[in-house]
């Protein structure tokens, strides 16, 4: 038996159950609702200039409170789309372009014709053009990032610069806004916004209250899934596997933080925890014969295949079977959930066969399997049934065949995972990842391979943007947002290495800030 050499969890059951949050219950709701009504009046106030409205919407989004004002925001953006005249500044044009695209409005890259070349000294405009460029789709050459990135890097070398702009530039170059996890961005931006001279006290108070109230709801979700995880006994009986319940819950906040989706977060945390455990059965524990038997049992959903397996592998099977029966209150859903889990386990088995035979697949072979083995299809199939009401027959067809929205989200998750984890996994003796496959196939250095993977991520984001913009799919908006948020969460979790299995300090700090530390009142 191999060993994953994983560290124990940092957050045990007793710690999670002991967490107290002052913002639970209705204590602060009266003040919050008052602030919300005042904010609605401000958003819809007559006489505001177009740019002022766009800046307010941008701040609402970055502070994490725009979901309270969806109707008002769409009303303003619809009006801007219909009646807007070309802006004379690069900054205003780029902000308008990004916000309209984010909200599903068709807006052409031609809006920038003649602007970008004449505004190279407008650093704020260049920053907003850089951020807008990440909403590009394939073939939109006007929105290439290279020259704006070069300009922004040069700007940071200057001594006498606007420190607020410099912070935003540095953050954008580290990871663009479109790729960032929404709730972490809100946590950071609240601190940034608090120090701005144009800060609106009403909006700041609303954002802080909202963050803390939502955080309290998340903690209740976490306590629930911690009790479930303890009851499964998997952490104790699978000592070779990653015990990462809090990290698994952290993923679900990235996918959908909205307080009313607590049930979805609880179910998706269970999905993530079972995926992590079963992944480690294939990667670390099982022999090839055992893994073949386990896969056969999953494929047939028949316990006869389990007879010769170790008890802890049987335990995994029964935990998964119990979970599917718990979730699928509608019998029609069961085949779709089982198919997704079967596809996942079959992809794990392919990787196990490569490992035991010491085979290095071609890049194409690897990628054809790896976008499934990263588990995004399983996660998103469950997400659909948790969001869609009623279920759409056409959507079920696209779901079973993994629509491009699922496929591109999965591919970003896979590639980001490979960038963050491949070094550690090779030390453990894992199957080669995309980096090693590309190095072997193209005879290039590791850094060249990593650069190629980064390029693939950028190109895949363009495809995901395109899939998001296409109206001809039967999925609810919230499902499409969840797929995009899963890709964002991948960028977050693997930005500084293996944030899921490795428990690096950056991920620990992010989890603490998001789950366990409230923001003090302004």
Curated annotation (Swiss-Prot):
Keywords: Chloroplast, Lyase, Magnesium, Metal-binding, Plastid, Transit peptide. The keyword Transmembrane does not apply. Signal peptide: none annotated. GO terms for cellular component: chloroplast. Mg(2+) 1 binds at residues 279, 283. It is an enzyme of class 4 (lyase). Its EC number is 4.2.3.111, 4.2.3.108, 4.2.3.-, 4.2.3.15. InterPro entries: Isoprenoid_synthase_dom_sf, Terpene_cyclase-like_1_C, Terpene_cyclase_plant_C1, Terpene_synth_N, Terpene_synth_N_sf, Terpene_synthase-like, Terpene_synthase_metal-bd, Terpenoid_cyclase/PrenylTrfase. (2E)-geranyl diphosphate binds at residues 242, 279, 283, 414, 417. The keyword tRNA processing does not apply. GO terms for molecular function: 1,8-cineole synthase activity; magnesium ion binding; myrcene synthase activity; pinene synthase activity; sabinene synthase activity. Binds 3 Mg(2+) or Mn(2+) ions per subunit. A motif (DDXXD motif) lies at residues 279-283. Its cofactor is Mg(2+); Mn(2+). Confined to flowers. Pathway: Secondary metabolite biosynthesis; terpenoid biosynthesis. It catalyses: (2E)-geranyl diphosphate + H2O = (S)-alpha-terpineol + diphosphate; (2E)-geranyl diphosphate = sabinene + diphosphate; (2E)-geranyl diphosphate = beta-myrcene + diphosphate; (2E)-geranyl diphosphate = limonene + diphosphate. Mg(2+) 2 binds at residues 279, 283. Belongs to the terpene synthase family. Tpsb subfamily. The Asp-Asp-Xaa-Xaa-Asp/Glu (DDXXD/E) motif is important for the catalytic activity, presumably through binding to Mg(2+). Monomer. This is Terpineol synthase, chloroplastic.
């Amino acid at each position: 038996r191999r060993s994953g050499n994983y560290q124990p969890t940092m957050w045990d059951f007793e710690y999670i159950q002991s967490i107290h949050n002052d913002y639970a219950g209705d204590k602060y709701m009266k003040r919050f609702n008052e602030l919300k009504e005042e904010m609605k009046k401000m958003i819809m106030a007559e006489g505001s200039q177009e740019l002022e409205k766009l800046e307010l919407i941008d701040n609402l989004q970055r502070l994490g409170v725009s979901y309270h004002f969806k109707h008002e925001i769409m009303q303003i953006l619809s009006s801007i789309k219909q009646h807007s005249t070309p802006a004379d500044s690069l900054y205003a044009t780029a902000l308008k372009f990004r916000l309209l695209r984010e909200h599903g409005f068709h807006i052409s890259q031609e809006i920038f014709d003649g602007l970008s070349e004449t505004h190279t000294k407008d650093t704020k405009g260049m920053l907003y053009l850089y951020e807008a460029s990440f909403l590009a789709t394939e073939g939109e050459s006007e929105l290439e990032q290279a020259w704006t990135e070069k300009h922004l890097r040069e700007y940071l070398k200057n001594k006498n610069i606007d420190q607020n702009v410099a912070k935003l530039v540095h953050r954008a170059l580290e990871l663009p806004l479109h790729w960032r996890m929404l709730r972490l961005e809100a946590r950071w931006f609240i601190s940034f916004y608090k120090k701005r001279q144009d800060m609106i006290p009403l909006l700041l108070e609303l954002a802080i209250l909202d963050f803390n109230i939502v955080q309290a709801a998340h903690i209740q979700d976490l306590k629930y899934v911690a009790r479930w995880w303890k009851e499964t006994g998997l952490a104790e009986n699978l000592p070779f596997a990653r015990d990462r319940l809090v990290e698994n819950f952290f993923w679900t906040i990235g996918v959908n933080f909205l307080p009313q989706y607590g049930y979805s977060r609880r179910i998706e945390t269970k999905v993530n925890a079972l995926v992590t455990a079963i992944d480690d059965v294939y990667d670390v524990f099982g022999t090839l014969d055992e893994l073949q038997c386990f896969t056969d049992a999953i494929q047939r959903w028949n316990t006869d295949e389990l007879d010769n397996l170790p008890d802890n592998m049987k335990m995994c099977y029964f935990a998964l079977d119990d979970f599917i029966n718990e979730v699928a209150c509608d019998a029609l859903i069961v085949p779709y959930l089982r198919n997704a889990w079967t596809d996942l386990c079959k992809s794990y088995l392919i990787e196990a066969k490569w490992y035991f035979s010491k085979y290095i697949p071609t890049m194409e072979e690897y990628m054809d399997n790896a976008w499934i083995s990263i588990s995004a299809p399983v996660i998103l199939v469950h997400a659909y049934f948790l969001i869609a009401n009623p279920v759409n027959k056409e959507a079920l067809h696209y779901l079973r065949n993994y629509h491009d929205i699922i496929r591109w989200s999965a591919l970003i998750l896979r590639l980001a995972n490979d960038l963050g984890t491949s070094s550690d996994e090779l030390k453990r003796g894992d199957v080669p990842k995309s980096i090693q496959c590309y190095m072997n196939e193209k005879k290039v250095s590791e850094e060249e391979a990593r650069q190629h993977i980064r390029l693939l991520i950028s190109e895949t984001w363009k495809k995901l943007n395109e899939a998001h913009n296409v109206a001809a799919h039967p999925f609810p908006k919230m499902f499409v947002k969840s797929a995009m948020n899963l890709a964002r969460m991948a960028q977050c979790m693997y930005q500084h290495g293996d944030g899921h299995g490795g428990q690096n300090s950056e991920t620990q700090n992010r989890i603490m800030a998001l789950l366990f530390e409230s923001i003090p009142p302004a």
